[in-house]
Amino acid sequence: MRLALSLILGLVCVFTIPAVNYSQGGQMEASRTVAGGGISVPGWVGKIDTKEEAGGAKLENAKLEKQGDGLHVVTGPAVTYWNPANKATGDYTVKATFKEPKYMNLNNHPHPYGLMIAGNDLGTDQQSYLYCAAYGNGNFIVRGFGPAPFQMNGGRGAPDPAVNKAAGPGEPVTQEIALSVKGDKVECSINNKVVASYDKAALVTAGKLKSTDGIYGIRFAHNTEAIVTGLTITKP
């Protein structure tokens, strides 16, 4: 009887634990639920990470809304947002400006946000895309899904002098991020400096991207807030 009760209590604990993420540096932190969450920008859709879904989180636990000419994002679970009409082919550059109004206001350590390109089969269990994201502490990461997660510059990313640092928690910090496809190269630029460059063949391969052609959008880690402006694509 005692054994059966212990097993039941154990199962209750397993199924009531909130979604948990391991962030940069290995910190463990539960994803929040954002009040008034969901997507209110016409034409836009999104998908939270599979591990967030497995923990019981929903897309409605994060928020995407219009704020002036920009997009206001508050997470919640880690999420990628896109408009299916935003497609890029051939050589192109996608860029946007990300302003974190209050650095680390929803977390106790830095969390990243940035751009996503090369999106294919988005919203399905076979989705693939690449993203470059900045932290307000001067670090950046280049990662993707194919459909399993993959990393291009290590598990903890890398620092670069081009990445702006917030003066401290609660202070604003802004990053201009761009992802470019140029011939056989894919590059990430932050604040007008190329911080990472890869051969296209290293990205368009089994377990990574299906193509560099695809949908572009924005990518946010969990428990993060920023305003995105100037999301544009240019062709050479």
Predicted regions located by residue number:
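Secretory/extracellular carbohydrate-interaction modules
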Residues: 75-151
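Beta-strand-rich interaction surfaces with strong enrichment in secreted/lumenal proteins
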Residues: 80-86, 161-169, 218
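Flexible glycan-contacting loops in extracellular carbohydrate-active proteins
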Residues: 198-229
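Low-complexity, Ser/Thr/Pro/Gly-rich disordered linker/stalk regions
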Residues: 25-106
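Extracellular beta-strand elements of beta-rich domains used
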Residues: 96, 229-233
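Bacterial N-terminal signal peptides
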Residues: 6-16
